[in-house]
């Protein structure tokens, strides 16, 4: 029994009005009662949630902070669906975590989502945070946004302390993943899921006119340059996004960027969402928290 058959239904007709928003809404009800502080932050075109696990000091610009970009194929999920993961990350990193509820497909393009992520970063800068105090992190599609945001910030002369990616989708082109050996065993994604994602991304980009032209499809792995933040990636050994994780690490290393990939055998895509119930998820997030602490001093 896997999630793959459920996702396959939506992938056959991705443009139908599926109630993707209900996933995050339902997750809000299911979040356990805890002493974690969750503060809503208004951004120009979206919102964010500033999360502090018990014992973590307020986000006052004096210590480290994490910008977290959730996964969900640019289509679904949010701060609620990722609430347990983010709370654990806040605990292990000893840092507030700003989770961006960026605009989603199909009504909004990936470029618009990226702008929301940039706005969240700027919100922290206006609160007094310096780049070397800020870590960019994301899972799945959020990994794409985190790397792309790091590249945009690099062009603006900003270098965050580190980049952390969990099971990242880093290449929008579908063919390399569909040809990967894990495509037949991935418990989450079949080949049709990548067909559907490509269709949704292209359709939304075509409707977003930038400087008189449709938004271009951006491939971050084609724009790896020296000077990007040090990078840690955690990925399952059985998922098809292992392809993207390894390709990114290879290209980052070739550009002189410190890049580490930790492969978790026997796990599924984004298994860290099962924290704290699954021991491996908790161990992974603890390691990520240690990495963030070390990167920010």
Regions picked out by a protein language model, each given a short descriptive name:
Residues 1-56, 207-212, 297:
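A glycine/proline-hinged amphipathic helix-loop "lid/cap" segment
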Residues 44-49, 53-297:
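Alpha/beta-hydrolase superfamily serine-hydrolase fold, recognizing
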